[in-house]
Amino acid sequence: MGLATTTSSMSQDYHHHQGIFSFSNGFHRSSSTTHQEEVDESAVVSGAQIPVYETAGMLSEMFAYPGGGGGGSGGEILDQSTKQLLEQQNRHNNNNNSTLHMLLPNHHQGFAFTDENTMQPQQQQHFTWPSSSSDHHQNRDMIGTVHVEGGKGLSLSLSSSLAAAKAEEYRSIYCAAVDGTSSSSNASAHHHQFNQFKNLLLENSSSQHHHHQVVGHFGSSSSSPMAASSSIGGIYTLRNSKYTKPAQELLEEFCSVGRGHFKKNKLSRNNSNPNTTGGGGGGGSSSSAGTANDSPPLSPADRIEHQRRKVKLLSMLEEVDRRYNHYCEQMQMVVNSFDQVMGYGAAVPYTTLAQKAMSRHFRCLKDAVAVQLKRSCELLGDKEAAGAASSGLTKGETPRLRLLEQSLRQQRAFHHMGMMEQEAWRPQRGLPERSVNILRAWLFEHFLNPYPSDADKHLLARQTGLSRNQVSNWFINARVRLWKPMVEEMYQQEAKEREEAEEENENQQQQRRQQQTNNNDTKPNNNENNFTVITAQTPTTMTSTHHENDSSFLSSVAAASHGGSDAFTVATCQQDVSDFHVDGDGVNVIRFGTKQTGDVSLTLGLRHSGNIPDKNTSFSVRDFGDF
């Protein structure tokens, strides 16, 4: 009674899980040889739906049988399973247009021990494979092999995990190719590839043939099928799990696993529906442009709402930065602890990709918040906060201020990247150094307009941990003590440069004026010289006899000598004179003087030969009487 109940439950369980593990056990082979040969020809069932095989029900019932079961019980089990296989074959006899066939062409020939000394051909292996496209869609991950040994035991075995994984991979490629291609040429090419895979699986099964032969009772070979079924079941579970795709995406993000495959899939998905994507994108861009350009003026209530939204977005942006900095600090702590144990630089291969991935996540989040913030600022008309910096010179802006602002921005960027060493901390009165650094950085970043708005003050108060009044007071003092002197110094320096330039221009103009005046002065001097020369040449036609015979001349000389004047000089220019020549041509000086005797003396400006006793020889007028 117990045996019949067990047989019935086993047959029902086997009927429920038909299709993938189609086998007949090996109890009393002699009573079912003809039926077994027919079962070998119907191993592949065309169009049959392949359910997931669960080994718990069948194997547990198999383990309930004793190791040396009698012939009657074994024969009943064999007849029952053979009958079910024949019914299955008759039911699918009409659907014989399958493109797949058994992986083992010589499946009728096998070797199993029927007794200790005799070898005879026995059924060794059956392999079932889904054939129709509908079955591919429904059950793609069902594959397995069954080995039936003659003699004293029965062995249920699946292919190895590696072979099963390869089979699953090739089968998924084949199914995807068949689903995606409709032409007969592509289908034939993939079918050829699948035939190559069958040969590979055949070689693998033939190389591992001796591992599946069992001699003895059933219990001795039960551990291998259980291990194989559990491994292949784990693979099926992982492949069909709903967490597989998210896990693959995470691996792609962190370790760049399958990056190209995922990119191709995303591109194919985007290109599969180009009209919808393009239309939606175009419509969105046009609508956003229209709202940006034609946005009506905001009401006071809307403006207040956008102000609140702007403050919230700024706080969110600050929170993202704070979380990212906290993540970097925690990661650095882990890296330091790992380096202390494993050596310096040992954590770099493990943390680089993770840091890049997390930085990408934080950047995406920050960009999303920044886009919303920019939109709110544009609606409020705050172009500086929106990132639309005005081009050209504004009020109070000079090229020097612009250069200073650029240098300060570069210095701040270097500080953020860690390229510049941080200043050593030192105790300081007043506000905390960290808060002062944040406020000073904001001041130099907005050097052209160092007047924070209410939202900026609120954000700076959150960043520095100060109150809003402290932030306002600090900016008032900073504008008076720091910003204003710098601006005044810049303007003074520019004014000084302008004055120097003006002085240089004035000096150049003065030099030009002096040169012009010198040129003008040289021209009248030349005219006067010409005039004097002309007037001096008029009395040169006089002769010596005229001077001697003129009584008025002599009287004038005498009167001059008695008048008290000691001497006077008369210059005459004798040029082209033919009657009077004294020592050649040239200018001769005649000096009239008075001696102690009262006689008029005359001195000629002649060079003496050296033997003249007196240098200033005077002659009387009487001496010239005969001349």
UniProtKB/Swiss-Prot annotation:
Family classification: Belongs to the TALE/BELL homeobox family.
The protein, known as: BEL1-like homeodomain protein 4
Disulphide-bridged cysteine pairs: none
Molecular function in Gene Ontology: DNA binding; DNA-binding transcription factor activity
Transmembrane segments: none
Subcellular location: Nucleus
Residue numbers spanned by region SR/KY domain: 241-257
Taxonomic source organism: Arabidopsis thaliana (Mouse-ear cress)
Any GO BP: mucilage pectin metabolic process
Record's keyword annotation contains Nucleus: yes
